[in-house]
């Protein structure tokens, strides 16, 4: 049986670094909620069986009317960390017929620059891989190490062979669930899915990502994301 594809969008964060009273995934960019662009990219990939959005149980900002016409489901099962939200979402996917052998693509809600083309490139590259992998970019900037709380450079780090992880991150549902459970049992709260897979002893692959697929994190990121999205909307 051919493994099916599922998308999981953890959307339970508060976006405290963005400087906004409203969680950043609901901020309006180029006329739409930031989250809308992520959902629209996966909606355009009809090969996906389901896209599941994981919200915080007490999320009062989500309004389904802002995403009318897009195909997705919502579960209010977000946890206290990204790792917990993803794990809870993986467990909920069983309700939609997902099996351990099926693929899940976990994507940050705050990466509105994702495109159907990049999603399909990732799937095409990894669909026969025994582990899975992520989209990422080779590090282009010079890296400086600065002690915590300080402002003086301790040393320059080599950027050779370093890649900056992005999302989506694509793994078998069962493998990812067990990897996160193992990390959780051993007291680790990991910041992406590939870290859990690595912790379990597997070797994920990297697929070339895109500069436009950056994560909206700081206040100045919104203007850049809006310019990119407005240009894409006008071009279409």
Curated annotation (Swiss-Prot):
Taxonomic superkingdom: Bacteria
Biological process according to GO: isopentenyl diphosphate biosynthetic process, methylerythritol 4-phosphate pathway
EC number: 2.7.7.60
Signal peptide as annotated in the record: none
Pfam families (alphabetical): IspD (PF01128)
Site note Transition state stabilizer, residues: 17, 24
Alphabetized GO MF terms: 2-C-methyl-D-erythritol 4-phosphate cytidylyltransferase activity
Reactions catalysed: 2-C-methyl-D-erythritol 4-phosphate + CTP + H(+) = 4-CDP-2-C-methyl-D-erythritol + diphosphate
Record-annotated site: Positions MEP for the nucleophilic attack: 159, 215
Keywords assigned: Isoprene biosynthesis, Nucleotidyltransferase, Transferase
Pathway listed: Isoprenoid biosynthesis; isopentenyl diphosphate biosynthesis via DXP pathway; isopentenyl diphosphate from 1-deoxy-D-xylulose 5-phosphate: step 2/6
Function: Catalyzes the formation of 4-diphosphocytidyl-2-C-methyl-D-erythritol from CTP and 2-C-methyl-D-erythritol 4-phosphate (MEP).
PANTHER family hit by this protein: 2-C-METHYL-D-ERYTHRITOL 4-PHOSPHATE CYTIDYLYLTRANSFERASE, CHLOROPLASTIC (PTHR32125:SF4)
Family, as annotated: Belongs to the IspD/TarI cytidylyltransferase family. IspD subfamily.
Protein's recorded name: 2-C-methyl-D-erythritol 4-phosphate cytidylyltransferase
This protein's encoding gene: ispD
């Amino acid at each position: 049986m051919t493994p099916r594809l599922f998308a999981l969008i953890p959307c339970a964060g508060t976006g405290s670094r963005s400087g906004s009273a409203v969680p950043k995934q609901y901020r309006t960019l180029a006329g739409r909620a930031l989250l809308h662009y992520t959902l629209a990219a996966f909606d355009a990939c009809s090969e996906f069986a389901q896209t599941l959005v994981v919200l915080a149980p007490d999320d009062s900002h989500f309004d389904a009317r802002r995403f009318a016409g897009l195909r997705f489901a919502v579960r209010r099962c977000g946890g206290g960390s990204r790792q917990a939200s993803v794990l809870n979402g993986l467990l909920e996917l069983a309700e939609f017929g997902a099996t351990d052998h099926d693929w899940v693509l976990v994507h940050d809600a705050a990466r509105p620059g994702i495109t159907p083309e990049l999603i399909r490139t990732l799937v095409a590259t990894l669909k026969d891989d025994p582990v899975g992998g992520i989209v990422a970019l080779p590090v282009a900037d010079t890296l400086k190490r600065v002690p915590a709380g300080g402002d003086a450079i301790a040393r320059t780090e080599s950027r050779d062979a370093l890649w900056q992880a992005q999302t989506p991150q694509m793994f078998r549902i069962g493998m990812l669930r067990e990897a996160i459970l193992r990390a959780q049992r051993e007291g680790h709260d990991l910041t992406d899915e590939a870290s859990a897979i690595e912790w379990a002893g597997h070797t994920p692959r990297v697929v070339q990502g895109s500069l436009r697929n950056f994560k909206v994190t700081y206040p100045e990121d919104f203007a850049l994301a809006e310019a990119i999205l407005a240009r894409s909307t006008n071009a279409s």
